[in-house]
């Protein structure tokens, strides 16, 4: 993304910072940060629609056969529509802000199409413990239907996030890129999983669009920060036929719609004040 506009205004003893981000598909993401003298920050975000046509990607017949699943053709057609994996914001806190308390679904990780077995409640954990060590690192540790989140050190001031409506979140000791980025580690492509035609061509630029580089659980080590992802919505996991199916339509996020959501950041002296901070409507 890139910032296309940023303006600041002062009103009622508060300062509003309005930032417009242009996303790769042509959507605008407009975020307004209203900052009060007591440190409270109200965040309101709007995602605008786009009708930009997706780019068609050619896939070899060998790859189609190697990745065949029941309904795979329908899944490919569905995947050709512009969708958004998640809509939200992310920020980082010092590693000392490792203690996490939240009012949402838990204690296990859960997603919008994988959450009926988790109960809504108030849970206490740490960013370290929220990590789920999949053998192949990937998205993990998400929690849905969340009302508020408190992050704090063992002693001292903390931060409470109060949602305007139900949100999802991750709070982990790694970045998104650590788990699911081609550039996370300089591992080679696993060419034995490619078709003979693709192996013969040995085109690394083409390979990244077929089978991504793989890294493993032993490649993940905690960073010196806590990365917090706050999502209006993250699309479902899918995979109802074992591994290949797309999420159901109501668990997807079409890019041709507008979305608006928000939350408020409230500084507190300790995580024990989370319940009190969450009582108020900051909008």
Give the ranges of each region predicted by the language model.
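Beta-strand/loop-rich accessory regions of lumenal/periplasmic or secreted enzymes
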Residues: 1-283
